Amino acid sequence: MVQRLWVSRLLRHRKAQLLLVNLLTFGLEVCLAAGITYVPPLLLEVGVEEKFMTMVLGIGPVLGLVCVPLLGSASDHWRGRYGRRRPFIWALSLGILLSLFLIPRAGWLAGLLCPDPRPLELALLILGVGLLDFCGQVCFTPLEALLSDLFRDPDHCRQAYSVYAFMISLGGCLGYLLPAIDWDTSALAPYLGTQEECLFGLLTLIFLTCVAATLLVAEEAALGPTEPAEGLSAPSLSPHCCPCRARLAFRNLGALLPRLHQLCCRMPRTLRRLFVAELCSWMALMTFTLFYTDFVGEGLYQGVPRAEPGTEARRHYDEGVRMGSLGLFLQCAISLVFSLVMDRLVQRFGTRAVYLASVAAFPVAAGATCLSHSVAVVTASAALTGFTFSALQILPYTLASLYHREKQVFLPKYRGDTGGASSEDSLMTSFLPGPKPGAPFPNGHVGAGGSGLLPPPPALCGASACDVSVRVVVGEPTEARVVPGRGICLDLAILDSAFLLSQVAPSLFMGSIVQLSQSVTAYMVSAAGLGLVAIYFATQVVFDKSDLAKYSA
């Protein structure tokens, strides 16, 4: 009895809770990083054309952009014995587990269900890829909100998101490393099966372990029921009335969308410049990262993804994919190293020099990848892009913090910003609780890790709860419901949306470009070209007060 009580107290300790929550962060990033590496070659192997393969990769980001606001609003108003966040985390985790089962077994399931398995195999594989990408990226939203709920004190908030960023990086490293191993010749092959079955079986075990850790998270201890604002009559909902919850979530979403559209359209010029520069930089980097393994397998190793298993062409392609996975692992490792020293680099050279150097380094690395036929040079170039990855994770959000610390200087035309309404006039509705103020932004997404443990600027976590919110009045017409007010978190979320948008455009167009050019080198050429465009827009970013006079002239 005493031992059980001691274990219970140990698990409820703040550091233990921090580790338990961030275990899921680690598991999510392992699955997403391995998916980014392995899914494009897998789609090509089953006969999906290049242009359609890239479109499949865009399903998850597009659905994420649409569904994240609804999920954030629904999570904020959820009431249940397991808290507000974990039911959504578990539901999305089920989608991830289903995708990890479907992807390596699509052919086997199709053969069981119909005599002509090819169309069904493609459909099941696309369903699995879409589920993995969508559920994996969207699951970060309630997870980050859970961290914010549990660690409200500013100091604890910064520590929580430092550990969060580290687990993102660690998960990315492992996720990129696992596909680089030849599992067909490993000791696990007799038990788990082929390369795909071994890899996705391990991912399932890792992810199940990480999800199980959330069962021990004491969410209720840190999160009580949200009371309606004083003077407002919120509708009373039965804790088991799911239709009522759904109606409330949709109603709040309807109130949010017009307000968010208004806020985005009125984005100040300084933030707009930063958003465009970040979008172009992320588009270049994601074009490189999404299609790097396919480029190495087809372009560098001269393999053929659609060749029969066991043939020389297929063997070369598989070797190239494993070498590409190693290159992305090095990218993640270099990103982690630069994140750890980013603060010193900025203090030594300044934000402008470090940011421009990181953006300029990318087209150099991508250009070397296009021109060289050496595996060592191409792998080293992939590792160099980790510098760009690290800078994009951190510096744009530091600049946004600077803008908000000196609003009168950098954001003089912030119309309608009254500093927020009183608590008697508003009900807080969370929207897009992305990487929070007080931590390097991991962008989890999705795709890859590499934020590191850089101590964040104090101004980034000044509030007790690091969430993105807008104020919505309850029980009023739509026009009267919106209360003026715009904080740093909303602008950070808008900047963070550049990451999701950066995956959509390459997914739509890169396949067609490669088919027209008849060469996978077009992936790297396009990435280098986008990198050059990003350099131009990076030079237009406002880094200090002197830039305001220069760009307004």
From Swiss-Prot:
Reaction catalyzed: sucrose(out) + H(+)(out) = sucrose(in) + H(+)(in)
Tissues/organs with expression: Prostate specific. Expressed in all prostatic glandular cells. Expressed both in normal and cancerous prostates.
InterPro entries the record matches: MFS (IPR011701), MFS_trans_sf (IPR036259)
MF term (GO), any: sucrose:proton symporter activity
Compartments, as annotated in UniProt: Membrane
Transmembrane feature ranges: 19-39, 52-72, 88-108, 120-140, 161-181, 198-218, 275-295, 323-343, 353-373, 382-402, 522-542
GO CC term (a single one): membrane
Pfam families per record: MFS_1 (PF07690)
Highest taxon of the lineage: Eukaryota
Keyword Cell membrane recorded: no
Induction: Up-regulated by androgens.
Endpoints of the signal sequence: none
UniProt entry keywords in alphabetical sequence: Membrane, Symport, Transmembrane, Transmembrane helix, Transport
GO BP annotations listed: hexose transmembrane transport; positive regulation of fatty acid biosynthetic process; positive regulation of glucose metabolic process; regulation of oligodendrocyte differentiation; sucrose transport
Topology in the lipid bilayer: Multi-pass membrane protein
Family affiliation: Belongs to the glycoside-pentoside-hexuronide (GPH) cation symporter transporter (TC 2.A.2) family.
More info: Marker for prostate cells. May be used, in case of prostate cancers, as a target antigen for prostate carcinomas-directed cytotoxic T-cell lymphocytes.
Annotated function: Proton-associated sucrose transporter. May be able to transport also glucose and fructose.
Name of the protein described by the UniProt record: Solute carrier family 45 member 3
Source species of the chain: Homo sapiens (Human)
Lineage: Eukaryota, Metazoa, Chordata, Craniata, Vertebrata
Record gene name: SLC45A3
